[in-house]
Amino acid sequence: MNGKEIVITGLGVVSPIANELNLFWEGIKSGKSGISRVESMEDIDQFPVQIAGEIRNLDIEKYMDSKEARKVDPFTAYGVAAASMAVEDAGLDKFSFDQERAGVLVSSGIGGMKYLQTQHKRALEGGPKRVSPQLIPQMITNILAGYISVSYTHLRAHETSP
């Protein structure tokens, strides 16, 4: 950073505990766990560990077009939802950002794992030619920062940090 202040003006959360900030905070304070038996995998019984923190009850169409939501990995959809919640929490207009003063920073170790799993299955069943050319773009973590940036009047400053 160059010594300038950063201001966080709004918060958004997509979590196994809750997908609304006030419910999430109440859950944290009360010690609620978001860990439970995995419901999103048909073959979960094959695995020795069958618990995880899954996102449930998120109406993604509140935050992005349903057609677009089907194209992107849940990692991206969840990030867009959380960013939208943060903008709303801040009381900001989606299209009123000063491109010179606003930016996006995403920190994540890895991105689109569900997309990777889907493409791995396609490769095993049909060979490498069945793998989507979107595999790498959907997996890399900076897809989310870029997607959010484009969604909000093409913010110039967008980064991804491990």
Please identify what each model-predicted range represents.
Residues 1-68:
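ACP-dependent fatty acid/polyketide chain-elongation machinery
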Residues 153-162:
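Conserved small/polar residues in nucleotide/adenosyl-binding loops
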Residues 85-130:
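Hydrophobic alpha-helical hairpins/lids featuring a short glycine-rich hinge
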Residues 51-58, 118, 139-152:
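Acidic-glycine-rich active-site phosphate/pyrophosphate-binding loop
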Residues 13-22, 66-84, 131-140, 156:
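Active-site pocket-shaping loop/turn-to-helix segments
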Residues 1-2, 95-99, 128-129, 141, ...:
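Solvent-exposed alpha-helices and their adjacent loops that cap or buttress functional pockets
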Residues 30-32, 56-61, 115-130, 149:
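Glycine-rich phosphate-binding segment of PLP-dependent enzymes
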